[in-house]
């Protein structure tokens, strides 16, 4: 059975390491803030100028002036700091962010990423995605395995405008977890009840299964 969105976010939260500085992309990745493992102290950063994002607020905690880059209301943890976009992007471009968890519309088995526009459709802009994939030490994609119409999102080549080439290190979907390697995709983990036959049918490229040592 496929993971729910919360289960996907919880799986992605397992990528977090103690003391890391992490950027969560707009959409599904923002749910990761609600699933940070006990004992793991991370600093979540947002391009609009906040370091120290906490979980999403309850009804009595909402502050309309405290938002993330996707304009969602958030909370701030103790010790959080606020700054301008120039400082925020200096953190990103300067290589000071350890991990970015980003959504995607398409990704290839070589780690190419398309996540900012569909030609002919209105978009607000590319946001910080291009800066993130160029400046962050590790990039994890968190997305549904296939599109709403059933078409593949993991492909040999993206046909949407690229955000970055060879930038993705790991792909987490509602069905599985893959590592992007020089030799292609390696299946690390599958959701409970999801078999290889289903995965191969819903993945637009070949992959190998990680060997257990």
Swiss-Prot record:
Active-site residues (renumbered): 47
Enzyme class label: transferase
Keywords linked to the UniProt accession: Lipopolysaccharide biosynthesis, Transferase
PROSITE patterns listed in its UniProt record: COA_TRANSF_2
EC number in record: 2.8.3.5
GO molecular function: CoA-transferase activity; succinyl-CoA:3-oxo-acid CoA-transferase activity
Reactions it catalyzes: a 3-oxo acid + succinyl-CoA = a 3-oxoacyl-CoA + succinate
Taxonomic superkingdom: Bacteria
GO terms under biological process: lipopolysaccharide biosynthetic process
NCBIfam families: pcaJ_scoB_fam
Quaternary structure (record): Heterodimer of a subunit A and a subunit B.
Protein family according to the UniProt entry: Belongs to the 3-oxoacid CoA-transferase subunit B family.
Name this polypeptide is given: Succinyl-CoA:3-ketoacid coenzyme A transferase subunit B
Lineage: Bacteria, Pseudomonadati, Pseudomonadota, Gammaproteobacteria, Lysobacterales
Gene giving rise to this polypeptide: lpsJ
């Amino acid at each position: 059975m496929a993971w729910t969105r919360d289960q996907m976010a919880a799986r992605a939260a397992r990528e977090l390491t103690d003391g890391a500085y992490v950027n969560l992309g707009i959409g599904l990745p923002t749910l990761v803030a609600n699933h940070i493992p006990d004992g793991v102290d991370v600093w979540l950063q947002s391009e609009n100028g906040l370091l120290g994002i906490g979980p999403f607020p309850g009804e009595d905690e909402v502050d309309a002036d405290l938002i993330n880059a996707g304009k969602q209301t958030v909370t701030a943890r103790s010790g959080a700091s606020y700054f301008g976009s120039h400082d925020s992007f200096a953190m990103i471009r300067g290589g000071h962010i350890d991990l970015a968890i980003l959504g995607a519309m398409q990704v290839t088995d070589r780690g190419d990423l398309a996540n900012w526009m569909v030609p002919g459709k209105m978009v607000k802009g590319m946001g910080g995605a291009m800066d993130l994939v160029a400046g962050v030490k590790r990039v994890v994609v968190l997305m549904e395995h296939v599109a709403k119409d059933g078409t593949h999102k993991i492909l040999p080549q993206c046909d949407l405008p690229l955000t970055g080439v060879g930038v993705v290190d790991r792909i987490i979907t509602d069905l599985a977890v893959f590592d992007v390697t020089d030799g292609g995709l390696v299946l690390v983990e599958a959701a409970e009840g999801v078999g290889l036959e289903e995965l191969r049918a819903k993945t637009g490229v070949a992959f190998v299964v990680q060997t257990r040592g």
